[in-house]
C-alpha cells in the first residue's frame, strides 16, 4: 500500500505499445515458439501480458497498456515461449529489455523504437537474439485512434543498401546481395554495390540509427535535434525503396504542372501557365533515360513494359488502365537515382512541350500508345506476378479416387495452408500409375468441378431454366457444413487460375463482378433474369401511380415453400410510390443477387483470395475474369486444325483427313469430350489452341500415327496433348474407335 501511495505523489501516465518482435531465437529444431510479451513496472505491482502469437519468430501484437510511472520506476519487457513456461522456473525465456528512468524519459513521445533483446543477467546461459519494437506516449499525446504500422519496415534500415535478410528452412538467418546475387552468413556492414564495384560512391541512405539497448538505458532515446527528424525522413524513404511490394508516393509536380489523362488512357502533363502539354514527366530530368533498370528494382504490381511499333519503350498501368512513357520507378525514386549518380539537381527549365492538338501526323509514333483491353498481355502480367509467389521447392500432392473425388479432395485441400496450394500441383488417382506433368491435374479439375458445381449437391443452382449458368443456392444451409464447402470451392477456383488450368462450368456475369468487388446494378439483371429486369425497367420508366399495388416486400420459393422477405424494416406495410420506386428497384436488385447468400459468397471469396490476392485482379473486368477461370467454352475447329502438330503423318494422310471429318461431325459436347480425352480439359485457353500447355510449357495438340493393331483404341497422352491413332483401314472404323475411346475409357498409366 505504501508503494501505491508513493506513486500517487508524482507518477505520470504513459501508454506503452508493444508492436512486434523480430528474429527471435529458435530453441527447438522442429517447432517455432508461441510468443507473448510480458510488461512489468518493477516494484509497483503493474503487470500485463500480450496475446500469444503461435508458431513464429516474428510475432506481431500491436497492443497497448496504460502505465503509472514514478520518477525512479523502471519497465521490464520480456518475451516468452508459451509452450515452455509451465515446465520449470525461467523456462521459455526468449529475451528482455529493461528501461530505466532516464531511458523512459528519452524514449517518451519519439515514436516506435527498436530495442535489442538481452539476457536476464550476465551469468544467464540462455541464448537470446532479436529485437522488440515499442513506443511510449505521454497521456496528453494519446489520440483516440491507433496508428497503423507496417512492422517489417521498422527493421529494413538495419541493413545497408542492396541487402536483404532471409531465413533458411532451419531458421538460420542469411543475407542476400541483390547486386552480386550472392548470399552470406555474416551480417553486412557496407552497401551491396561496394562488393562488386569498390570505386562506386556510397549510397546516401546507408544511415543507420544507433541501436537502443535495454540493459542500462544509457543509449536509449533520441533528442529533438532537427537533424534526427531529417534522418528519419530519409530512412523512411530508404525503407520504401527497399520494399519489394510498395511504390511510395512520388514527389509533388513542379509548380504550374498538372497530371492529366486522355480519354484513351494516356497520361500527360499540362503546364497551366502556358497551356502546353508534354508526355514527359517534368519531375524526371530527360538525361535519366539511360538509368540501369536493375538499380530501380521491379515494376510496381500491375505495371508492364511494352514497346511501340517503332521500338520505343512505354509503361502500362493495368490498375488504372493508363499508359505513359516515364518509368514509374523513376518518378518515385528520383532522389535515390540522382544521389546514386552523385549528381546535384540543378534548376531545370520547363521541359520542351508540344500541344496535343498541334501534334503532327508524322510524329504520331511518338504518342503514348492508348490503353487497350489486351487480355493476353494482362494475363501474361498476372502469370508473372503469380510465378513470383510460387515456392521453388516442394509439391502440393493430392491423391484421390475417382469414385470419391469430391469428398477426398475436400478433406485434403482444406487441411492445407494457403501457401501450400501455391506449390507445384501433383495429382494422383488411386490405383493408377500416371505421372502428373499437367494432364492429370487438368483431368482432376475437370472431374472435380463437375461434382462440386453440380446442383444435385445443393451448393449451386441454375440461374435460369434455359441457360445453364450457375449461381449460389440461397438454401444451401440444408448442408450444415455448407460454408466450409464454399471455402473449398473458392480455393479450387484459385488453384485453377494459379496453376494455369480451368474450371469446367460457368457462373453468371454478376458473380464474377462480385468476385472482383464491384457493385451490382440493374443492368446486371438482364442476363440473369430478363423478365424481372424488364419489369423493373418498366417501373422506372413509367408512372406507377394507381397502377401497381406493390409494397417493400417480395416473395420467393424455397423448396416449394413460399417465403416473404421485407426489403426494409416493416416493408410489408410500406407501399411503393412514384417517389420511392427507385429505392424499391435498388433494394430489389440487391436482394435478388444477395438473398441469403452473403455468408456463402464471403466464404467462397475468402478461399479464392487465399490463392489469388485480390489486388492482382484489378486490371480485369468480369468478362475477362470469366475467361481466366473457365477458359473458352466454344471450340473453334479451324483454329484447332491450324494449331495441330502431325507426327509420322501428313495433312494428306487418311488418318488425319478422317480425324478432322469425325471432329466436324461431332456436336459441341462430343468435341469437348474429345478435347478432354486428349488434353485433360474440355476448355480452350483464352488465347486459343496455340496456347495449349504441356509438361514443360506450350505444346500443340498432336496427332500421332502409330504402328499398332487396328483393333486397338486410340490412346491419349494428356501431359503432351497427343493422341496416338493406329492406321485404321476405313473412316467408319476410325469413327467407331474414336467414339468408344472418348465415351468409355478413363484412367492413367505409365508406359
Curated annotation (Swiss-Prot):
Nucleotide-binding found in the keyword field: no
GO biological process, one term: protein ubiquitination
Gene Ontology terms: cellular component: cytoplasm; membrane raft; nucleus; plasma membrane
Pfam family, one: C2
Region of interest: Disordered: 214-236
Location of the protein in the cell: Nucleus; Cytoplasm; Cell membrane; Membrane raft
A GO molecular-function annotation: SMAD binding
SMART domains from the UniProt entry: C2, HECTc, WW
Polar residues: compositionally biased ranges: 214-226
Residue ranges constituting the HECT domain according to the UniProt record: 417-751
The C2 domain, residue ranges: 1-119
Entries under InterPro entries matching the protein: C2_dom, C2_domain_sf, E3_ub_ligase_SMURF1, E3_ubiq-protein_ligase, HECT_dom, Hect_E3_ubiquitin_ligase, WW_dom, WW_dom_sf
Catalyzed reactions per annotation: S-ubiquitinyl-[E2 ubiquitin-conjugating enzyme]-L-cysteine + [acceptor protein]-L-lysine = [E2 ubiquitin-conjugating enzyme]-L-cysteine + N(6)-ubiquitinyl-[acceptor protein]-L-lysine
Residues annotated as catalytic: 719
UniProt pathway: Protein modification; protein ubiquitination
Function field: E3 ubiquitin-protein ligase which accepts ubiquitin from an E2 ubiquitin-conjugating enzyme in the form of a thioester and then directly transfers the ubiquitin to targeted substrates.
Name of the protein: E3 ubiquitin-protein ligase SMURF2
Lineage of the organism: Eukaryota, Metazoa, Chordata, Craniata, Vertebrata
Gene assigned in the entry: smurf2
Amino acid at each position: 500500500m505504501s508503494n501505491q501511495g508513493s506513486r500517487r505523489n508524482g507518477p505520470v501516465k504513459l501508454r506503452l505499445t508493444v508492436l512486434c518482435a523480430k528474429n527471435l531465437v529458435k530453441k527447438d529444431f522442429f517447432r517455432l515458439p508461441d510468443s507473448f510479451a510480458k510488461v512489468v513496472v518493477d516494484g509497483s505491482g503493474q503487470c500485463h501480458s500480450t496475446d500469444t502469437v503461435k508458431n513464429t519468430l516474428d510475432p506481431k501484437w500491436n497492443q497497448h497498456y496504460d502505465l503509472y510511472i514514478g520518477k525512479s520506476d523502471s519497465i521490464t519487457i520480456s518475451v516468452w515461449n508459451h509452450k515452455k513456461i509451465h515446465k520449470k522456473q525461467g523456462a521459455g525465456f526468449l529475451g528482455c529489455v529493461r528501461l530505466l528512468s532516464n531511458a523512459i524519459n528519452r524514449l517518451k513521445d519519439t515514436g516506435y523504437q527498436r530495442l535489442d533483446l538481452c539476457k536476464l543477467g550476465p551469468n544467464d546461459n540462455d541464448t537470446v537474439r532479436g529485437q522488440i519494437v515499442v513506443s511510449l506516449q505521454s497521456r496528453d499525446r494519446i489520440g483516440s485512434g491507433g496508428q497503423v504500422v507496417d512492422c517489417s519496415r521498422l527493421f529494413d534500415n538495419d541493413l545497408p543498401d542492396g541487402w536483404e535478410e532471409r531465413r533458411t528452412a532451419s531458421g538460420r538467418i542469411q543475407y542476400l546481395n541483390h547486386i552480386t546475387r550472392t548470399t552470406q552468413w555474416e551480417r553486412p556492414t557496407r552497401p551491396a554495390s561496394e562488393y562488386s564495384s569498390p570505386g562506386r560512391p556510397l549510397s546516401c541512405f546507408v544511415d543507420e540509427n544507433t541501436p537502443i539497448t535495454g540493459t542500462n538505458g544509457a543509449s536509449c532515446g533520441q533528442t529533438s535535434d532537427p537533424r534526427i527528424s531529417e534522418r528519419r525522413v530519409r530512412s523512411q524513404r530508404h525503407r520504401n525503396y527497399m520494399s519489394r511490394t510498395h511504390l511510395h508516393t512520388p514527389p509533388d509536380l513542379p509548380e504550374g504542372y498538372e497530371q492529366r489523362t486522355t480519354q484513351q488512357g494516356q497520361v500527360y502533363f499540362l503546364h497551366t501557365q502556358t497551356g502546353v502539354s508534354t508526355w514527359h514527366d517534368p519531375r524526371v530530368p530527360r538525361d535519366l533515360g539511360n538509368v540501369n533498370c536493375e538499380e530501380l528494382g521491379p515494376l510496381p504490381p500491375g505495371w508492364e513494359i511494352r514497346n511501340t511499333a517503332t521500338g520505343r519503350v512505354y509503361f502500362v498501368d493495368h490498375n488504372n488502365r493508363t499508359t505513359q512513357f516515364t518509368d514509374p520507378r523513376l518518378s518515385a525514386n528520383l532522389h535515390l537515382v540522382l544521389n546514386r549518380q552523385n549528381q546535384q539537381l540543378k534548376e531545370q527549365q520547363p521541359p520542351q512541350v508540344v500541344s496535343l492538338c498541334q501534334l503532327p501526323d508524322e510524329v504520331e509514333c511518338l504518342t503514348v500508345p492508348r490503353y487497350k483491353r489486351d487480355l493476353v498481355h494482362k494475363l501474361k502480367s498476372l502469370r508473372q506476378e503469380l510465378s513470383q509467389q510460387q515456392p521453388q521447392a516442394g509439391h502440393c500432392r493430392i491423391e484421390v479416387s475417382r469414385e470419391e473425388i469430391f469428398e477426398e479432395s475436400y478433406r485434403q485441400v482444406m487441411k492445407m495452408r494457403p501457401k501450400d496450394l501455391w506449390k507445384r500441383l501433383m495429382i494422383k488417382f488411386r490405383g493408377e500409375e500416371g505421372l502428373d506433368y499437367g494432364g492429370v491435374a487438368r483431368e482432376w479439375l475437370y472431374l472435380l468441378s463437375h461434382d462440386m458445381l453440380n446442383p444435385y449437391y445443393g451448393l449451386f443452382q441454375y440461374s435460369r431454366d434455359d441457360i445453364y449458368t450457375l449461381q449460389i443456392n440461397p438454401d444451401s444451409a440444408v448442408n450444415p457444413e455448407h460454408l466450409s464447402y464454399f471455402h473449398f470451392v473458392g480455393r479450387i477456383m484459385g488453384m485453377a487460375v494459379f496453376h494455369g488450368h480451368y474450371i469446367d462450368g460457368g457462373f453468371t456475369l454478376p458473380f464474377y463482378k462480385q468476385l472482383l468487388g464491384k457493385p451490382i446494378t440493374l443492368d446486371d439483371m438482364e442476363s440473369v433474369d430478363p423478365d424481372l429486369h424488364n419489369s423493373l425497367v418498366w417501373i422506372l420508366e413509367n408512372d406507377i401511380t394507381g397502377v401497381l399495388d406493390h409494397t417493400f416486400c417480395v416473395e420467393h420459393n424455397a423448396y416449394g415453400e413460399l417465403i416473404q422477405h421485407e426489403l426494409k424494416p416493416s416493408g410489408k406495410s410500406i407501399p411503393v410510390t412514384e417517389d420511392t420506386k427507385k429505392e424499391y428497384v435498388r433494394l430489389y436488385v440487391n436482394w435478388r443477387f444477395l438473398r441469403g447468400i452473403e455468408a456463402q459468397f464471403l466464404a467462397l471469396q475468402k478461399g479464392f483470395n487465399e490463392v489469388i490476392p485480390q489486388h492482382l485482379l484489378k486490371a480485369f473486368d468480369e468478362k475477362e475474369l470469366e475467361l481466366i477461370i473457365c477458359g473458352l467454352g466454344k471450340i473453334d475447329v479451324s483454329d484447332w486444325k491450324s494449331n495441330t502438330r502431325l507426327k509420322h503423318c501428313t495433312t494428306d494422310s487418311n488418318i488425319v483427313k478422317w480425324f478432322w471429318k469425325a471432329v466436324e461431325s461431332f456436336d459441341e459436347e462430343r468435341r469437348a469430350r474429345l478435347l478432354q480425352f486428349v488434353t485433360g480439359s474440355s476448355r480452350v485457353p483464352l488465347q486459343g489452341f496455340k496456347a495449349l500447355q504441356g509438361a514443360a510449357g506450350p505444346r500443340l495438340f498432336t496427332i500421332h500415327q502409330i504402328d499398332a493393331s487396328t483393333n486397338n483404341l486410340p490412346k491419349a497422352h494428356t501431359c503432351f496433348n497427343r493422341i496416338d491413332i493406329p492406321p485404321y483401314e476405313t473412316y467408319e472404323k476410325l469413327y467407331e474407335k474414336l467414339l468408344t475411346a472418348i465415351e468409355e475409357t478413363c484412367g492413367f498409366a505409365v508406359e
